[in-house]
């Protein structure tokens, strides 16, 4: 049966509205520089020219625009004696989906690379681009919002592929074509895109061979102009070690005379995987002679195929017995999801991801000495928890269900990284004189969102679980709330608060403990303990919990909040409306938009009001537009009622704005 399409507002263009096969699902934007391939694009692919892009004509702009500003970060005293501050940094190149397949606002599956170890990252590249889909890929809003909440900048990708992978030199020439004034229109366009969408710059990878010295000179001038224009907008540019200054492609595996001008023209350079200990040592020295920071060089570490079993000469990059040589870039760490079998669960993914980022010990205070040098053992973690209010429900940005106040508000799987909370950076530091309990994100139950924090073990001594490095000001009116539950056994719970940091890296955090109650399985379900920190003044430097039990116990933490008393609900959004609809065999897809609420808002949540008056969660976003697929009438209704609420940092919800859609 063919699809019928109705548009409510001109945010879906007339051509799309007239098409009987229109798909209203918005995706992250991708383009060719200008000229398009010959032939016909494959299913689900739209060929576009960046040269022709204009923000005012972009019907998906509201869906792809990030809303969270880049947070400031601080580096606490390292949790071990191997991680360092002020030396090597880590970049990650992540393909969340193929170029044309990145939904703008999450999707109805929990099977997603929900990156969450932001504490160790300094730059995320939203990796993509292919000859058959498009060469320039802008990151989607959920990824940018999650990264920014944790202080990590995100770059889009400009990928000019090798001819063996379908590359065509005309696309390189399109990119660096000058206008009548000798300037580069597409450099300006790339800056315009990043500024409009709210991300932080571009990773430029020119690998199409066959160029000459003139093309090399044009590319260098293009990169310089891109950096100059980008710097004025607060953007950064990373160059990939491929094209040389003479226009040829020759991966150097080093910073040298063939590519140093590109490094000087950009903010950083990714050194191709062909590096050696000698080439990295020479690269760092050359960077410093050029007046640059050696840690602006990312040595490529390819983990796409083997993950933590990858063979890496770590001492060439981050030796343990002397200063780090350069920084490094992890190529395709989403292996932690991809290597798992079909049917993988969110819990299995996070177990693998923790193993990758923390190490085999699953405790960064106990760094491993095996062949995999996990990031937690190399670089000091960073945190953005430095102001009130602060709250978390340990929501990882995907789940099997959606919970509100401990009850299921939607039984559907989902993912949306923009809804991800700031999560514990040190996973999982547990200090005990006895047996160590296991700590994990659990998806079988939650207080809010899709997950909670679960501590499970056979206790023979108190165990302190370190949760957050903080810089939170304390006053007599400061309140800390723990929403928690005992699933098995009886557990005595204490809030752990530190007013100072350890003197040396690797030393235990000097906590003070505040009683938070004793819970017994099967008694009261979820319980919220509100604690005033009487006698504790100054700045909270770390937060955790201490658990005491005898024998087997399972304790679940659903939420943690630190606030001043007297919090109020946020103002409501307005003008919720349907901006596009498309009906087909699987139901009706709707595009929604609304006017943002005045004042601070963490995100917005969209619900459907069912005929009986109950509400079903449809999704959430930090922006002001959302897409919902496959809706159907329920209970004989002739129209469906929807409501949008603003949610603040403490998860207080505003009054709703409503709209109705007739079937």
Language model features by range: what are they?
Residues 464-497, 527-532, 543-545, 560:
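Extra-cytoplasmic beta-strand recognition segments
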Residues 433-464, 518:
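Short carbohydrate-recognition loop motifs
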Residues 20-64, 297, 301-438:
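Substrate-binding cleft of secreted/luminal carbohydrate-active enzymes
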Residues 504-540:
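Extracellular carbohydrate recognition and processing domains
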Residues 603-637:
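Recognizes extended acidic, P/S/T-rich segments that occur
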Residues 83-282:
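Chitinase-like catalytic core of GlcNAc-active glycosidases
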Residues 586-601:
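Conserved aromatic anchor
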Residues 626-660:
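Beta-strand-rich modules
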């Amino acid at each position: 049966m063919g699809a019928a399409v109705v548009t409510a507002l001109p945010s879906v263009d007339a051509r799309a509205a007239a098409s009987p096969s229109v798909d209203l699902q918005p995706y992250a934007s991708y383009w060719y520089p200008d000229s398009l391939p010959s032939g016909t694009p494959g299913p689900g692919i739209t060929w576009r020219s960046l040269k022709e892009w204009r923000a005012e004509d972009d019907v998906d702009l509201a869906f792809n625009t990030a809303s969270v500003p880049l947070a400031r970060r601080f580096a606490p005293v390292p949790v071990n004696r191997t991680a360092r501050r002020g030396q090597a940094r880590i970049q990650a190149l992540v393909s969340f989906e193929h170029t044309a397949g990145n939904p703008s606002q999450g999707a109805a599956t929990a099977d997603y690379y929900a990156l969450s170890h932001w504490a160790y990252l300094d730059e995320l590249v939203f990796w993509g681009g292919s000859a058959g889909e498009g060469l320039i890929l802008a990151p989607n809003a959920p990824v940018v919002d999650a990264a920014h909440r944790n202080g990590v900048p995100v770059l889009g990708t400009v990928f000019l592929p090798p001819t063996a992978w379908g590359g065509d030199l005309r696309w390189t020439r399109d990119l660096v074509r000058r206008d009548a004034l000798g300037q580069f229109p597409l450099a300006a366009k790339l800056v315009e895109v990043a500024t409009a969408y709210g991300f932080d710059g571009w990773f430029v990878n020119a690998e199409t061979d066959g160029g000459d010295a003139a093309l090399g000179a044009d590319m260098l001038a293009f990169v310089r102009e891109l950096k100059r224009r980008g710097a004025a907008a607060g953007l950064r540019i990373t160059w990939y070690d491929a094209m040389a200054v003479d226009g040829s492609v020759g991966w150097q595996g080093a910073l040298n005379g063939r590519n140093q001008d590109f490094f000087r023209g950009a903010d950083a350079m990714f050194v191709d995987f062909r590096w050696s200990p000698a080439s990295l040592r020479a690269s760092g020295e050359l960077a410093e002679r050029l007046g640059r920071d050696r840690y602006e060089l990312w040595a490529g570490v390819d983990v796409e195929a083997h993950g933590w079993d990858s063979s890496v000469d770590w001492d060439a990059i981050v030796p343990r017995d002397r200063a780090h040589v350069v920084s490094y870039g992890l190529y395709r760490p989403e292996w932690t999801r991809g290597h798992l079998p079909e049917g993988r669960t969110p819990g299995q993914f996070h177990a693998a991801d923790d193993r990758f980022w923390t190490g085999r010990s699953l405790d960064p205070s106990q760094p491993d000495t095996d062949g995999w040098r996990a990031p937690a053992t190399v670089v000091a973690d960073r945190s953005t928890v430095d102001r009130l209010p602060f709250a978390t429900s340990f929501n990882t940005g995907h789940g099997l269900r959606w919970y509100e106040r401990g009850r299921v508000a939607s039984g559907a799987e989902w993912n949306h990284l923009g809804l991800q909370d700031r999560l514990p950076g040190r996973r999982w530091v547990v200090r005990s004189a006895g047996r160590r309990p296991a700590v994990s994100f659990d998806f079988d139950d939650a207080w809010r969102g899709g997950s909670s924090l679960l501590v499970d073990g056979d206790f023979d001594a108190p165990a302190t679980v370190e949760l957050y490095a903080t810089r939170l000001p304390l006053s007599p009116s400061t309140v800390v709330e723990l929403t928690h539950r005992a699933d098995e056994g009886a557990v005595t719970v204490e809030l752990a608060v530190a007013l100072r940091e350890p003197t040396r890296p690797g030393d235990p955090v000097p906590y003070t403990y505040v009683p938070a109650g004793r819970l017994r399985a099967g008694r009261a379900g979820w319980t919220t303990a509100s604690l005033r920190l009487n006698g504790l003044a100054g700045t909270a430097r770390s937060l955790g919990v201490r658990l005491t039990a005898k024998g087997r116990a399972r304790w679940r933490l659903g939420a943690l909040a630190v606030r001043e008393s007297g919090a109020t609900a946020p103002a409501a959004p307005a003008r919720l409306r349907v901006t596009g609809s498309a009906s087909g065999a699987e139901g009706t897809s709707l595009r929604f938009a609304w006017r943002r609420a005045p004042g601070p808002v963490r995100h917005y949540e969209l619900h459907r009001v069912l005929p009986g008056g109950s509400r079903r969660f449809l999704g959430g976003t930090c922006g002001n537009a959302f897409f919902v697929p496959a809706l159907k009438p329920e209970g004989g209704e002739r129209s469906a009622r929807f409501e949008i609420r603003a949610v603040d940092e403490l998860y207080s919800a505003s009054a709703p704005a409503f709209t109705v859609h007739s079937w």
